């Protein structure tokens, strides 16, 4: 999808940023520049943990940093009266999801793609990279690992499906 045309560049950047950080749509819509900090390990994003006063730090990977640089340039070009410290200036939720559906269609994706797909992408990529389920749950702002188990189940089903494909490839 990344290389396909999207009806709005802001939608594309916000969706991809969520793919790289695991933020929910509302969190991306409300994300402010003061939630992004420089730490010893690079840029991090601070986010609340559900049903808690805690805050967790999520590392910002290079592709997400590039999106932030683009957003920062766009922010700097806004007239002073339009600056509200939000990182992304997005359309309504309905329009946002319409853009995502059109974008998926442009990418020849037949599945139901919506903003939540970006969080699923983040979680499955993190687990495939070997990130611990507990760490993933924290990065996603979840206060228990059980809530993140759904992503591990997706990986297990994917593994089973790939195992069958491998078996079929080697059967004579």
Regions found by a protein language model. Name each.
Residues 1-25, 29:
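Basic, Lys/Arg- and aromatic-enriched nucleic-acid-binding interface segment
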Residues 3, 56-59, 66, 70, ...:
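DNA/chromatin major-groove-contacting recognition/catalytic segments
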Residues 10-12, 90-94, 110-129:
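Short basic/aromatic active-site micro-motif
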Residues 14, 18, 71, 104, ...:
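Short helix-to-turn junction characteristic of helix-turn-helix DNA-binding domains
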Residues 21, 30-70:
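Conserved tyrosine-mediated DNA breakage-rejoining catalytic core shared by Y-recombinases
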Residues 35-42, 110-112, 131-151:
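Short, polar N-cap/turn motifs at the start of nucleic acid-interacting alpha helices
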Residues 49-53, 93, 140-165:
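Catalytic-site neighborhood detector that most strongly recognizes the C-terminal catalytic loop/helix
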Residues 50-69, 81-102:
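C-terminal catalytic core of Y-nucleophile DNA break-rejoin enzymes
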């Amino acid at each position: 999808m990344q290389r396909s045309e999207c009806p709005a560049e802001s939608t594309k950047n916000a969706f991809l940023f969520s793919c790289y950080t695991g933020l929910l749509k509302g969190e991306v819509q409300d994300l402010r520049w003061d939630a992004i900090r420089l730490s010893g390990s690079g840029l991090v994003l601070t986010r609340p943990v559900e049903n808690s006063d805690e805050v967790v730090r999520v590392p910002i990977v290079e592709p997400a940093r590039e999106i932030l640089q683009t957003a920062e340039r766009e922010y700097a070009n806004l007239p002073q009266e339009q600056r509200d410290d939000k990182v992304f200036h997005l359309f309504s939720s309905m329009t946002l999801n319409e853009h995502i559906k059109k974008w998926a269609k442009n990418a020849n994706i037949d599945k139901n793609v919506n903003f939540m797909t970006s969080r699923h992408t983040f979680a499955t990529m993190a687990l495939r990279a070997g990130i611990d389920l507990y760490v993933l749950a924290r990065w996603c702002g979840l206060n228990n690992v059980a809530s993140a188990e759904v992503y591990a189940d997706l990986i297990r089903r994917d593994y089973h499906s790939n195992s069958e494909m491998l078996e079929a490839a080697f059967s004579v």
